[in-house]
Amino acid sequence: MFENLCALQLDSDLFAQAIHPEEPIVAVGLASGHVQTYRLPPGASDDSDPDEALAAEKGFGHIATTWKTRRHKGSCRTLAFSVDGSSLYSAGTDGIVKVADTTTGRVTAKFAVPLDLANGGIDAPTLVHALSPQSLILGTDSSALHIYDIRDQGAKSAFKPQATHRPHDDYVSSLTPLPPTEASTSGFSKQWVTTGGSTLAVTDLRRGVMVRSEDQEEELLSSVMVTGLSKKGTSVGEKVLVGGGNGVLTLWERGVWDDQDERITIDRSKGGGESLDVIALLPDGVGPGGKIAAVGLGDGSLRFVKLGPNKIIDELKHDELRQEGVIGLGFDVTGRMVSGGGKKLNIWGEKTWQDVPEDDEDEQEEEAPANGKREHESDEDEDSDEDMEESSEDDEPKQKRKKRRKGKGGKQAKGHGILHFSGLA
């Protein structure tokens, strides 16, 4: 279904990944505190030069580092683009949230994460999410969920929480907005689902925590919303998929939040399944059709589940050599899949060779490099953060956050590599 187009080597372990909503741009946050953005080659769905798009489709494109800087003291834990993609939010173990211009990387605003009420220390962030042009949500280790009104970032009160909720007893591990109802006048979500510990909760922008599920007796780590499913019986055709720490994907019917509706086993490794750390839904027009979820596992596997039959239809490996968990997973505006984990970022495209005549396929194989793909090393000469409103260059490196590591599990899929990007050293 997908083949590896390019592998980019990172300078430090990946802790966060974000994909631009309107342009082929990927941002990464690293254990070293660095934040870096890459611009991918244009795709068929871009409005760019058709010749460039054709070159990228044939495997001849260039991935450019737009900017790179040490943004945080310690590690960068989470990243998120604004709704229109003009700003990039980052938050680190230094207890600071910074807002940067996506194009230049220059910091335009910053504010401190509220301290942990239990000990008065830094309450490290776990996620940041731009719900709308008006609202920003920040989750922390202490289970706090802070809501900010960011319409006027110049106001002194702009970066003080308008409200704080605690939907879980443990840290907030994932957040998924619920689609706005037909009665919505803004077109933006005002409710969202979060996971934390062994519970799922629904929170409303104005009314706070509305419902919390029963204890699922398993760790809930990731989530994604799926719409357009079959409406049978009382089903509204909308479900939230939740990835668990034991290799099971659970489905939750919208509006029925007390308990899960269905279960799909993704991994059956001995000693308990691998954790399902991240989930992304294939965009319309990508893949063989139907609703398909891509799931990133703690052992570095990528598995694809077709909803309805609820069956695994394909499997890939983020890294053939190392068993690093998949930390980031998503699709850019052109439909390419981006997976991140360890010190590696992979760009995947849909397989194209199935529809190529045998003669043409032979010619392509002769022209392809022997190893099928090339590694892209990070640029060591990128600008530092000296020209920005930063003071983190003088800090000593902090200890990296411990990452979840489990035993080997699952069958490794053979790597693809018929396409590649040229010019990547």
Curated annotation (Swiss-Prot):
InterPro entries: WD40/YVTN_repeat-like_dom_sf (IPR015943), WD40_repeat_dom_sf (IPR036322), WD40_rpt (IPR001680), WDR55_POC1 (IPR050505). WD repeats lie at residues 9-48, 71-110, 117-158, 219-262, 321-358. Residues 354-425 are annotated as: Disordered. Residues 356-368, 378-396 have a biased composition (Acidic residues). Coiled coil: none annotated. Keywords: Nucleus, Repeat, WD repeat. One of its GO terms (cellular component) is nucleolus. Disulfide bonds: none annotated. Pfam families: WD40. It is found in: Nucleus, Nucleolus. It comes from the Eukaryota. SUPFAM superfamilies: WD40 repeat-like. Residues 399-414 have a biased composition (Basic residues). Belongs to the WD repeat WDR55 family. PANTHER family: WD REPEAT-CONTAINING PROTEIN 55 (PTHR44019:SF20). This is WD repeat-containing protein JIP5.
